[in-house]
Regions:
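Short beta-strand segments of immunoglobulin-like
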Residues: 177, 217-221, 338-343
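Low-complexity, Pro/Ser/Thr- and charge-rich linker/hinge segments at domain boundaries
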Residues: 306-321, 436-451
Length: 452
């Protein structure tokens, strides 16, 4: 995978044409997934378990790639006169009638190219014309050429795919839950619910679970030293429990492990956890009961404990919670092209909190920029901080990365286990971008284009 767009470089992308994926794939049940994973693990025992964990999605996975042993057939060639103008420097007039997504098929392209370009068209949506005033005519001409803007495809006037699904926010992708105060204690009230989750607006919803009616659950954010009371009402038809992952408890009965530190929370029951947030850092909360199913279906969320004085300085913040069970490979409960891009202006520093709530390791690779890793599992690394462009995050781990944007462009940002990000229909799943613009005002322009 290469940079999707770098205004300083004329290189083409890997995929240059698009058509949406079929929505007729059946849903995958967690028991089915668990059986496959168990059998696969047994078959590969003795050194192959890692390979099993990193295997591609099953053929009938709702949002995974569709396996095919047959080669991709080339589409019929078309005459040069029927091809769109590759030198377009502006989007076609709004009065022009949009043609079907994908447009005329250039010679030599396959259905893979068609689908792949459509995914990127959906990801950028009406950001594409907005980028003209940000990157300038020359860079925009290259982007228009890559995406075939002369086709006047429908996505040019539609919001990006991530703005069409619920529970996504441009600030940090996960809105914090506002507490109430009770004698100095910060009280957070949440429900544990059965929900329908939209991984992508063009896909059917999946039957999932969520805290506060959403997956991931609302971010619980406090300051080091705060007394925290988390009250959960179980609206499920089954028992559950809630574990605050990474918290150092004075009272181990607050640890949230049914039949170890508590009885399970029964349907209709309200259960309270109370503790002092003694250590700052990027933490998580999730089910710790029937967890393969419940966490895999969405019972997870971020728990951030801010230090009283934060030595880490940054301009913007994002939280990425990865999961790889229900719905395939997701970032914050959504898969590409419905993932929220990281936005930054040249010179700004972005903090990204990686949290792996899945069952597989995911190595996050950022194109064109460097990540400085300043914390692991909530613990500051101090002088042991290191730089990298690929960061492996194991299940249960959290890393805090700083990215100082130095190069304008649309930079790919993805898991580097390739079957988690690309299939026969192009990019999907754990793919995102870092969109770096020349000035801070341009970030505001992008946001305005999305929410207008």
């Amino acid at each position: 995978m290469d940079t999707l767009l770098n205004p300083a470089d004329a290189g083409a992308t890997d995929h240059e044409a698009g058509e949406a994926e079929s929505t007729g794939q059946p849903q995958l049940t967690i028991p089915g997934l668990s059986r496959r994973g168990f059998i696969r693990g047994l078959a590969l025992a003795g050194g192959g378990l890692l390979a099993a964990a990193c295997a591609p999605a099953a053929a009938n996975w709702t949002f995974g790639p569709v396996a095919s042993t047959a080669p991709i057939a080339a589409l019929p060639s078309v005459a040069a006169s029927a091809m769109p103008s590759a030198a377009a420097t502006a989007v076609a007039s709004p009065s022009a009638a949009p043609i079907a997504s994908g447009g005329p098929i250039p010679a030599g392209w396959t259905q893979h190219d068609v689908d792949a370009r459509t995914a990127v068209r959906r990801y950028l949506g009406n950001l594409t014309p907005a980028l003209k005033g940000i990157y300038g005519d020359v860079a925009f001409a290259k982007l228009a050429d890559i995406l075939g803007a002369a086709d006047n495809y429908p996505e040019l006037s539609a919001k990006p795919a991530f703005a069409q699904v619920p529970n996504l926010f441009l600030t940090d992708a996960l809105q914090p839950l506002k507490p109430t105060l009770d004698g100095g204690v910060k009280v957070f009230n949440l429900t544990i619910d059965e929900i329908n989750q939209k991984i992508d607006e063009l896909k059917p919803p999946v039957a999932a679970l969520g805290y506060g009616g959403q997956w991931p659950g609302p971010t619980i954010r406090v300051t080091q030293g705060d007394r925290v009371r988390a009250v959960f009402t179980n609206n499920l038809k089954e028992t559950t429990g809630v574990h605050f992952h990474g918290v150092q408890f004075d009272d181990f009965f607050q640890d949230g492990i049914p039949f170890v530190t508590q009885k399970p929370i029964t349907p209709g029951e309200t259960y309270t956890y109370e503790f002092t947030a003694t250590d700052a850092g990027s933490l998580m909360y999730h089910s710790h009961h029937n967890a393969t199913d419940q966490v895999g279906r969405g019972l997870l969320g971020a728990f951030i404990v801010d230090p009283k004085v934060d030595p880490v300085k940054y301009d913007r913040e994002y939280i990425w919670i990865s999961n790889d069970s229900l719905g395939g490979f997701t970032i914050n409960g959504h898969g590409f092209p419905a993932t929220v891009p990281v936005l930054a202006a040249v010179g700004e520093t972005v903090r990204i909190r990686f949290m792996n709530e899945g069952i597989m390791m995911h190595p996050w690779h950022l194109h064109g920029n460097v990540m400085k890793i300043v914390a692991r599992d909530g613990r500051p690394l101090g002088t042991a901080a290191f730089e990298c462009d690929t960061l492996g995050v194991n299940p249960g781990e959290r890393y805090d990365a700083l990215v100082t944007a130095t190069r304008a462009g649309v930079w790919a940002f993805h898991c580097h286990i390739l079957p988690h990000v690309e299939g026969t229909s192009g990019m999907f799943g754990m793919v995102n971008t870092l969109i770096v613009v020349p000035e801070k005002a341009h970030v505001d322009a992008i946001v305005k284009a999305i929410i207008s």
